[in-house]
Curated annotation (Swiss-Prot):
The record marks H265, G266 as: Cleavage. The chain crosses the membrane at residues 235-242, 265-272, 374-381, 382-390. Residues 138-509 form the MACPF domain. Membrane attack complex (MAC) assembly is inhibited by CD59, thereby protecting self-cells from damage during complement activation. CD59 acts by preventing incorporation of the multiple copies of C9 required for complete formation of the osmolytic pore. MAC assembly is also inhibited by clusterin (CLU) chaperones that inhibit polymerization of C9. Specifically inhibited by the antibody aE11, thereby inhibiting MAC assembly. CDD domains: LDLa (cd00112). The gene is C9. This is Complement component C9. GO terms for cellular component: blood microparticle; extracellular exosome; extracellular region; extracellular space; membrane attack complex; other organism cell membrane; plasma membrane.
Length: 559
């Protein structure tokens, strides 16, 4: 796309939250029972069920099991599948419905399209089989009108997983145009984009507010809740998070290169990753034995709004085939695998753009000792300034000056970026190109401070790689084609599967933490977020006793 550097005047929201570390999560795989901690609990699963009957059309049989207790207190986490399958020889004939397109054209993929869509230059079948054996030159629907394909339109309708995981694929074929040339004009770039059939409306608008907001959290668990709020508030879920697929066969291959988990290795064994699992665990791992402060910087850019068509949508061939491959009897593992591939819900409408979110881990004790205040940190990083995205260039306010990182007073000068006042930076960025992601990671690997200019660089790339930043959700089972054989049964099974999925990976299967600690379930392992006066993997250790002379325990960060 050529529009990544061409924005109209836009105003971004920068939210700055001060997350004071009055809560700390203390979990450590190195800690043993000999140190006086709680006894470790390994993942425990129920026995396998009996094998199902052989499905005559799928030629497979299935079995399942349940998670009884999640790993906790340095025990083994639950990472194994709850479903299993194997090939079989059916004893009954398959009564599978044959694809019949009637008077329409049947693609090699099995899709049925209108005959008028043949030989028009568009890939209406998804494999260009509708463009084979044409007797004359294609008749493009847009003729000589100049249009471009839109990344915003491709992203429209993308789903979410109720437990926070990024779906591996989208159900919508947003490169199908149904022979139409519906064009939408981006007022920022003056470019016309062709709107796919599935998208009922797409409005390009780069907007926001020039606004700074500061929030203060007395407990770190409340700060953590604020970070994951958008992933749980819509469903009133407890703190149960699952970022790694366990049921999908191709999960390992699919997930290694997703935008949310690209890795970059530096010298030695240090590894930086955008994996949500690692990111959240990194945030939770900071101990409050050294008083910490968390500077939460958040900026959103909205590029456009969309509404999906509510009927006659065109789904990808893969999505339709995967629905057909679901057994008509309810098999938990198979339906969970489907949910982990496509999400539990899809977006019927929403906003597209990017979310720039960083958490700076600040050493509060060092700041006090060296006379550095929070406003000095913000001024050094440039987050006290307004940011403008202009048509020809992207810039920050003229006041941004690297000299602001040196604070002078009482006969001394403190360089904020080199005095170990900023311990770490945790990235929760969504959207933007892979090129920018690698550039940012390289800076973090080198220990270079990330400031407002990095926000500007990121903003220039989100048109090429937008993400959903707000959405109205609909259950994925609403997309089951009504004319498909056994559609009603499979829709019922998917509805049941979503409920079972939430209950299967529930924090209720964790043991309680001691002394008022809060339990967090993350990727098959239960963690304890401890009140300020306690620490340990179960919040079992009183810091008051440590201060009275008992040996202190160390809690190195989990890698």
């Amino acid at each position: 796309m050529s529009a990544c550097r061409s924005f109209a005047v836009a105003i971004c929201i920068l939210e700055i939250s001060i997350l004071t570390a009055q809560y700390t999560t203390s979990y450590d795989p190195e800690l043993t029972e000999s140190s006086g901690s709680a006894s470790h609990i390994d993942c425990r699963m129920s026995p396998w069920s009996e094998w199902s009957q052989c499905d005559p059309c799928l030629r497979q049989m299935f079995r399942s099991r349940s998670i009884e207790v999640f790993g906790q207190f340095n025990g083994k986490r639950c990472t194994d599948a709850v479903g299993d399958r194997r090939q079989c020889v059916p004893t009954e004939p398959c009564e599978d419905a044959e694809d019949d397109c009637g008077n329409d054209f049947q693609c090699s993929t099995g899709r049925c399209i209108k005959m008028r869509l043949r030989c028009n230059g568009d890939n209406d079948c998804g494999d260009f089989s509708d463009e084979d054996d044409c007797e004359s030159e294609p008749r493009p629907p847009c003729r000589d009108r100049v249009v471009e394909e839109s990344e915003l339109a491709r992203t429209a309708g993308y789903g979410i997983n109720i437990l926070g995981m990024d779906p591996l694929s989208t159900p919508f074929d947003n490169e199908f145009y149904n022979g139409l040339c519906n064009r939408d004009r981006d007022g920022n770039t003056l470019t016309y984009y062709r709107r796919p059939w599935n998208v009922a409306s797409l409005i390009y608008e780069t907007k926001g507010e020039k606004n700074f907001r500061t929030e203060h959290y007395e407990e770190q668990i409340e700060a953590f809740k604020s970070i994951i709020q958008e992933k749980t508030s819509n469903f009133n879920a407890a703190i149960s998070l699952k970022f790694t697929p366990t049921e999908t066969n191709k999960a390992e291959q699919c997930c290694e290169e997703t935008a949310s988990s690209i890795s970059l290795h530096g010298k030695g064994s240090f590894r930086f990753s955008y994996s949500k699992n690692e990111t959240y665990q990194l945030f939770l791992s900071y101990s409050s034995k050294k008083e910490k402060m968390f500077l939460h910087v958040k900026g959103e850019i909205h590029l456009g709004r969309f509404v999906m068509r509510n009927r006659d949508v065109v789904l990808t061939t893969t999505f339709v085939d995967d629905i057909k491959a679901l057994p008509t009897t309810y098999e938990k593992g198979e339906y969970f695998a489907f949910l982990e591939t496509y999400g539990t819900h899809y977006s019927s409408s929403g906003s597209l753009g990017g979310l720039y979110e960083l958490i700076y881990v600040l050493d509060k004790a060092s700041m006090k000792r060296k006379g550095v205040e929070l406003k000095d940190i913000k001024r050094c990083l440039g987050y006290h300034l307004d940011v403008s995205l202009a048509f020809s260039e992207i810039s920050v306010g003229a006041e941004f000056n690297k000299d602001d990182c040196v604070k002078r007073g009482e006969g001394r000068a403190v360089n904020i970026t080199s005095e170990n006042l900023i311990d770490d930076v945790v990235s929760l960025i969504r959207g933007g190109t892979r090129k920018y992601a690698f550039e940012l990671k390289e800076k973090l690997l080198r220990g270079t401070v990330i400031d407002v200019t990095d926000f500007v660089n990121w903003a220039s790339s989100i048109n090429d790689a937008p993400v959903l930043i707000s959405q109205k959700l609909s259950p994925i089972y609403n997309l089951v084609p009504v004319k498909m054989k056994n559609a009603h049964l499979k829709k019922q099974n998917l509805e049941r599967a979503i409920e079972d999925y939430i209950n299967e990976f529930s924090v209720r299967k964790c043991h309680t933490c001691q002394n008022g600690g809060t339990v967090i379930l993350m990727d098959g392992k239960c963690l304890c977020a401890c009140p300020f006066k306690f620490e340990g993997i179960a919040c079992e250790i009183s810091k008051q006793k440590i201060s009275e002379g008992l040996p202190a325990l160390e809690f190195p960060n989990e890698k």
